[in-house]
Amino acid sequence: MASDLDPSTVVVHAGRPERVPNAPVGESPVFSSTYVAGGDRGYGRFGNDAWTALEETLGQLEGGRGVTFASGMAAVAAVCDLVPVGGRIVAPQHAYSGVLALLDQQAEAGRLTVDRLNIADTEAVVQAVTGADMLWIESPTNPAMEVADIPALAAAGRQTGATVVVDNTFATPLLQQPLSLGADIVMHSATKFISGHSDVVLGAVITADDDLWTAIELRRRSLGAIPGPMEAWLGLRGLRTLALRLERAQSNAAFLAERLLRHPRVSRVRYPGLPDDPGHARAVAQMSGFGAILSIELGGDGDYAQRVCECTELWVHATSLGGVESMLERRRRWPIEVPTIPEDLIRLAVGIEHPDDLWADLERALKTAT
């Protein structure tokens, strides 16, 4: 495939079967636990055509080689396992709570040590990365929406020998390519925007370093953290429409952010697309769009925020994101969420519905819950 194609074209055409007479236009799931001897697969845990197609597509979008996993957390666990026993990871203070919980568990078990900092504080992170084995970046962060200076942090990681990992779930490969910004590894919860329909659980890791790719693929193979063929195929099918879905969802998010900024019950809107947002300048520098996730705060009233989530009719009160339907939740309803996330913070994962309908439902909930 030509290297000068727009990512919105690559996402449609990458990973398809060779165009020969009578070949299928698209890849199909292969339901087999083993293969006839003589090839490089040998067993179902070693490869599947549906994985290969998804990995090839994600690899072309991110600029590396992909490895898919049974879930985003399986991908996280495989990457963290690259850190030697007794090693140290520098991680964000705010990030997906499942990742932070896993790091805490490994630290408590004596497997490694973890330093958690404000990932938007570049100077502090650069100082902390000296002597670290891995720097874990999430940008924008979940759910605080902080934006890291990926090029500066990646450069610091290279200088000190730390492996730099970027969780690109919120931005997707269409809005941000961390490998081109200097990262060593990029990972996704492909459950979210990649698959895009809230019907499959998947993870993915992409790297341009052959040694890292081999080490990560070996961990997937050894741990058995493989995606099922149907799940991989659903992920690929969803990925084909990412450009269209993201364009609409991002437009909706920007529309809602502006409306919410003026609402009397909303004390803060966290969205890097807003010119006054602390992460706006960085987002402009390293992203081609601001994404479809935003968070709002409601004057410190956690009970009110919870009632808002329970009063919506169109917005789904659920804990995921990246699907075609809009979802919202108060993140502190989860005991696992870090205590520095405000009690009244609601994360809005914006879908592809008509923006006027989304706003009317949200505005009604803000009023009804009072």
What are these regions (language model features)?
Residues 1-30:
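Short conserved active-site loop signatures built around small residues
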Residues 2, 67-263:
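Conserved PLP-enzyme active-site core in the AAT-like
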Residues 27-30, 34-82, 98-107:
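Conserved N-terminal alpha-helix of the aminotransferase class I/II PLP-enzyme fold
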Residues 134, 163, 185, 268, ...:
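Structural preference for beta-strand elements that scaffold enzyme active sites
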Residues 150, 245, 310, 326-370:
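PLP-dependent enzyme catalytic core of the Aspartate aminotransferase-like
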Residues 223-224, 311-322, 365-370:
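A common structural junction motif
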Residues 235-244, 291-299, 346-351:
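Short, well-ordered beta-strand elements within core beta-sheets of diverse protein domains
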Residues 254-313, 332-340:
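Conserved small-domain helix->loop->beta segment predominantly found in fold-type I
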